[in-house]
Amino acid sequence: AAVKYSKKFFEDVEFYPEDAGRADQDFLCKMVEEVIKAGATVINIADTTGYNLPEMYGKKIKYLMNNVPNIDKAIISVHCHNDLGLATANSIAGLQNGARQFEATINGIGERAGNTSLEEVVMALKSHPDLNLDTNIDSKKIVPISKKVSRLMNMPIQRNKAIVGANAFAHSSGIHQDGFLKNRDNYEIINPEDVGLKASSIDLTARSGRAALKHRLELLGFSFSKVELETIYINFIEMADEKKLLHDEDLYELMKKYK
């Protein structure tokens, strides 16, 4: 009745079967069939408690696609929660099995542990073009929008948050830094410019190696021999042990004795 009533006012009527993630498959199919008959155009399959594993959720979507006679008259949408940290994986599993809409939020904001992270799904699909699930979203706006939402909602972004966290494109381990400087593809699958950043960053810490230090010093205009670099590196490590993260002003201070 609610769907029929809504249809009097709106062409697009979306129906949410609450806790569909744990619902009986056949009961869910009958319900979906009836609401489509009543005029629903989108069926949001809600994993309300974040209970499902990706394989379970994907099978649920596939079962609906194969067992609801009038499923072609509506769009199946996925709506996942992150209670087990699986909202992104579950959403992608749903899309792989026939869903053609996913509901998500910037930075994964949402009830309890949050909802599906928009930026994660967008970049996962972009990184796997073989899935043929292009969102047509301008990914270069991801980081600016993420920062704006964080500021307006007064909700800091976790530093190691995928895609938009401060550490997402930062390299601090010496081995990683050396490999990254030789070929970015060694340690990055996403170009930072694709999400609205100017570049990746090399964080200089006590874990950094000679390659990263040499790279940064040369960018600052310093020149030195290979032998001199060894002495500079020893002093750098001593400073890094004390200050944890070194900035350009620290490097200028470090290099005063080598002018």
Predicted regions and their residues:
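Acidic side chains
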Residues: D19, D47, D83, D241, ...
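Structured core elements
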Residues: E14-Y16, V42-N44, I75-H79, Q101-T105, ...
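A mid-to-C-terminal "edge-of-domain" accessory segment
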Residues: M123, D130-K259
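General structural feature for long, well-ordered alpha-helical segments within catalytic domains
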Residues: A2, Y16, D24-M31, L53-K60, ...
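Alpha/beta enzyme core
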Residues: A1-I76, I92-A99
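Catalytic alpha/beta core domains of metabolic enzymes, predominantly
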Residues: N52, K59-K182, Y187
